[in-house]
Curated annotation (Swiss-Prot):
Transmembrane segments annotated in the record for this chain: 56-76, 89-109, 130-150, 151-171, 193-213, 239-259, 276-296, 339-359, 378-398, 403-423, 439-459, 479-499
Highest classification ranks of the organism: Eukaryota, Viridiplantae, Streptophyta, Embryophyta, Tracheophyta
Family according to the record: Belongs to the NRAMP (TC 2.A.55) family.
Basic and acidic residues: compositionally biased ranges: 535-545
Gene Ontology biological-process entries: iron ion transmembrane transport; manganese ion transport
Carbohydrate attachment residues: N11, N19, N307
UniProt name for this protein: Metal transporter Nramp7.2
UniProt xrefs under Pfam families: Nramp
């Protein structure tokens, strides 16, 4: 009987949301737990009286923190190899990737702002038990895969600065991260500002080098706007670029970070918040695009120069983060390696912060578990150290560099399991009501998303079949490997199809009753109660997420 009454309430409210009026729907706590009310978040909120630029600054933080992940060692490694191997031909991947990143990061922010819940919490509510656990495990794997480049990048930086073996540097990364998390207690904003400054110092060096080597503007523009995948390994490098740019854990992170901001509970207030978060993300990702453009352009120009010395030609043939400092010699001279190493160290540590928070939100959302930051980071880092240590001992610097590319490809293959739920939730009337994505955003995001998924599946299948044909293993070994791998590929494809076509079954949003104008007016103006009818919850201010060290 209760289920019938709830369904009747849904039927009464959802049509009102579709009549074209701007009724802001309220979050329904389907878990049965009371959400905290923020009684000071109404039209009298001081934020509502601020000038536009001051109001915008009060929302700044989440987008820039997320954007640090677009400048991590994984991005630098894939950029360097893309430039060295293909010159400017893969710049279009960077352009499309960051445009798509802006779309989905804004969708993640809007999802959190509109629902009062972040992506992992909504996944827990929507999907069956075993699907939920599989998504949680895949999300944790994405955090670990994203941490591998930070481990190796930090080890490379320590190798350049102190001439210690790479594998020893890998072991040291566990201690360096604990030191970083310990320093947060003494001024995390200052620490993050210092890290950001060092990262942008390295970016400035690449911009300076680009002005020195003067890449062909025509070739750069062709690379940006004419898609091409020619040459050996181009498809793999393109997938690695996408994996380094569009990371699954960033979607969970951004949808949670926005909840640390206080927003007035009105249509105008929440729409303003979505608008400001979009502007912030757009500005941050534009800077990230320019930096990635500079790195690829410098790498492509220097490594294709006709007067390249034999020593540098050998470096370009197997370019890694550990050997890339020579690219900055024209700007920095003999000090290029030291300055580059310090900036590389900062790049690795900045991404450690975002990875720690993303892991916390994923665990809290899916499993309702919380860990102290240092424990959470230590567990993730220890798991990431294991493959990095083995590869660095066996393969040295070049092997560790290839592991970064492999980790980026893993992130690209992991993407559908965070992206598809995000696209479905943000386009769903039962989740977002009238504030779901416009038809244009739905079409564009699904085309780009399915395009990336299709490329991944194509590369996975053709690459594996080609490897089976060309390797020197005995036929029995090939058959045994095929028996294991082909079912896994089929499971991957079926899982993507399941997430894509599964119909959402949980209604998490209800609008004001269409027969109660007072309720509709109250929701429009940010009031919490109507004179008649059921009391409706606000889109909650998440006090449990308000300890994020972001600038006020």
């Amino acid at each position: 009987m209760a289920g019938i009454q709830q369904q009747q309430l849904v039927n009464d409210t959802l049509p009102a949301s579709l009549n074209g009026s701007s009724n802001r729907i309220a979050s329904v706590n389907v878990e049965g737990q009371p959400q905290p009310w923020a009684d000071d978040l109404d039209l009298q909120d001081p934020n509502h009286q601020k000038p536009g630029w001051r109001k915008f600054l009060s929302y700044v933080g989440p987008g820039f923190l997320v954007s640090l992940a677009y400048l991590d060692p994984g991005n630098l490694e894939t950029d360097l190899q893309a430039g060295a191997n293909h010159r400017y031909e893969l710049l279009w991947v960077i352009l499309i990737g960051l445009i798509f990143a802006l779309i989905i990061q804004s969708l993640a922010a809007n999802l959190g702002v509109s629902t009062g819940k972040h992506l992992s919490e909504l996944c827990k509510t929507e999907y069956p038990k075993y699907v939920k656990y599989c998504l949680w495990l895949l999300a944790e794997i994405s955090v670990i895969a994203a941490d591998i480049p930070e481990v190796i990048g930090t080890a490379f930086a320590l190798n350049i600065l102190f001439h210690i073996p790479v594998w020893v540097g890998v072991l040291c990364t566990g201690c360096s991260t604990l030191v970083l998390l310990g320093l947060q207690k003494y001024g995390v904003r200052k620490l993050e500002l210092l890290i950001a400054v060092l990262v942008f110092v390295m970016a400035a060096c690449f911009f300076g080098e680009m002005s020195y080597v003067k890449p062909s503007a025509t070739d750069v523009l062709k690379g940006m706007f004419i898609p091409k995948l020619s040459g050996q390994g181009a498809t793999g490098d393109a997938i690695a670029l996408l994996g380094a740019l569009i990371m699954p854990h960033n979607l969970f992170l951004h949808s949670a970070l926005v909840l640390s901001r206080k927003m007035p509970n009105s249509v105008r207030g929440i729409n303003d918040a979505c608008h400001y978060f979009l502007i912030e993300s757009g500005f941050a990702l534009f800077i990230a695009f320019l930096i990635n453009l500079a790195v690829i352009s410098v790498s492509g120009t220097v490594c294709s120069a006709q007067n390249l010395s034999s020593e540098n030609a050998d470096r370009c043939g197997d370019l890694t983060l550990n050997s890339a400092s020579f690219l900055l010699q024209n700007v920095l001279g003999k000090s290029s390696s030291k300055i580059y190493a310090i900036a590389l160290l900062a790049s690795g540590q900045s991404s450690t912060i975002t990875g720690t928070y993303a892991g916390q939100y994923i665990m809290q959302g899916f499993l309702e578990l919380k860990m102290r930051k240092w424990i959470r980071n230590l567990v993730t880092r220890c798991i990431a150290i294991a493959p990095s240590l083995v590869v660095s001992i066996i393969g040295g610097s070049s092997g560790a560099g290839r592991l970064i590319i492999i980790a980026s490809m893993i992130l690209s293959f992991e993407l559908p399991f965070a992206l598809i739920p995000l696209l479905k939730f943000s386009s769903s009337t039962t989740k977002m009501g009238p504030h779901k994505n416009s038809i244009y955003i739905i079409v564009i995001s699904w085309i780009l998303g399915l395009g990336i998924i299709g490329i991944n599946i194509y590369y996975l299948s053709t690459g594996f079949v080609g490897w089976l044909i060309d390797n020197n293993l005995p036929k029995v070994g090939n058959v045994f490997i095929a028996i294991i791998v082909f079912p896994l590929m089929a499971i991957y494809i079926l899982a993507v199809i399941y997430l894509t076509f599964r119909k959402d079954s949980v209604v998490t949003f209800l609008g004001p009753n269409k027969n109660d104008p007072q309720q509709q007016a109250n929701m429009e103006n940010g009031l919490t109660k109507s004179t008649e009818g059921p009391e409706m919850e606000r889109v909650p201010y998440r006090g449990d997420l308000a300890d994020i060290p972001l600038p006020e």
